[in-house]
């Protein structure tokens, strides 16, 4: 597994976990429209609250799978592709809301990292990392 791919994989995953846990109820300056938290942001997009929880749970699951992919490489590519697809949706929602690029730059960044991870990592024929490889990361 390429070091650049591993960095992209881990960075994308940690970024998503940060947004959906520590920054969930915070005004970040990157929220859609004038939203001050995640609930308001989904309202700006015209999406109901249950959609927010479904999207959040899926993104957290994909990000977690990407982290596990550091030890079980074969799950990296599907998780990375899934996260990249969700980021396309996030970018689309920002565009729909008329947000300037600055507000969806984080979504573009995570999309780029997840796509890079999907391209470089996750060869389905690659065996699981050995204990020595895991410890050397």
Predicted segments, located by residue:
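Short amphipathic, positively biased membrane-proximal segments
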Residues: 1-137
């Amino acid at each position: 597994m390429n070091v650049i791919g591993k960095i992209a994989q881990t960075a994308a995953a940690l970024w998503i976990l940060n947004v959906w846990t520590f920054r969930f109820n915070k005004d970040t300056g990157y929220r859609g429209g004038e939203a001050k938290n995640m609930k308001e942001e989904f309202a700006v997009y015209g999406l109901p609250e249950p959609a927010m929880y479904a999207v959040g749970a899926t993104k957290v699951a994909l990000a977690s799978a990407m982290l596990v992919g550091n030890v079980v490489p074969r799950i990296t590519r599907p998780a990375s592709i899934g996260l990249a697809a969700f980021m396309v949706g996030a970018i689309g929602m920002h565009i729909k809301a008329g947000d300037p690029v600055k507000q969806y730059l984080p979504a573009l960044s995570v999309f780029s990292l997840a796509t890079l991870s999907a391209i470089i990592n996750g060869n389905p024929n690659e065996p699981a990392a050995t204990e020595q490889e895991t410890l050397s990361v």
